[in-house]
From Swiss-Prot:
Coiled coil: none annotated. This is Stigma-specific STIG1-like protein 2. Residues 1-20 form the signal peptide. It comes from the Eukaryota. Belongs to the STIG1 family. It comes from Arabidopsis thaliana (Mouse-ear cress). Keywords: Signal.
Length: 163
């Protein structure tokens, strides 16, 4: 009896699949949305197509405020620290901006120019206040810069009093 039921289910499924395939093949219409001329320029006549560079896009229009500066554009300081200290990067009297490799860099936080130009922090170290420190084990910079552990606590794996 079980063998007969398996045969009956198999025949029913085969019939359903066959009917589905036949109906989809006969009722499907292929619609194409191709243009008559795919290379035809669809811009209105008389318009000038110009793609300006990012430097031209920063140009100030007459009677308007200057556009926002492109954040990807490099500041070329050409070994002149005054450009970096007087620029928009400066954050007050204790600003630590300097010209490193023809770019303005913050010597207090940059891992590749920590304290001095081209002073790279080692693996696992972070530049905090111009010094390379291991934030995983430093009590004064536990887990992040300027996160001090309380008196008597140790910094382990970047957490004060771990375990």
């Amino acid at each position: 009896m079980a063998h007969f039921m398996k045969l009956l289910v198999t025949i029913a499924l085969t019939t359903v699949v066959t009917i589905a395939i036949v109906t989809t093949k006969t009722t499907t219409k292929t619609a194409t949305f191709a243009l008559e001329d795919p290379f035809k320029d669809l811009t209105p006549p008389g318009t000038i197509k110009i793609r300006p560079s990012r430097f031209l896009a920063e140009k100030v229009d007459k009677g308007k405020e200057p556009k926002a500066r492109n954040p990807n554009a490099a500041d070329h300081c050409n070994k002149d620290n005054e450009i970096c200290s007087s620029s928009d990067y400066s954050t007050g009297a204790n600003a630590t901006m300097a010209c490193c490799n023809n770019k303005c860099m913050d010597l207090s936080t940059d891992d590749k120019n920590c304290g001095l130009c081209k002073n790279k922090c080692k693996f696992g170290q972070t530049c905090c206040r111009g010094q390379c420190v291991y934030v995983a084990y430093d009590k004064r910079h536990c887990g992040e810069c300027n996160h001090r552990c309380d008196l008597g606590e140790f910094c382990v794996y970047g957490l004060c009093n771990y375990a």
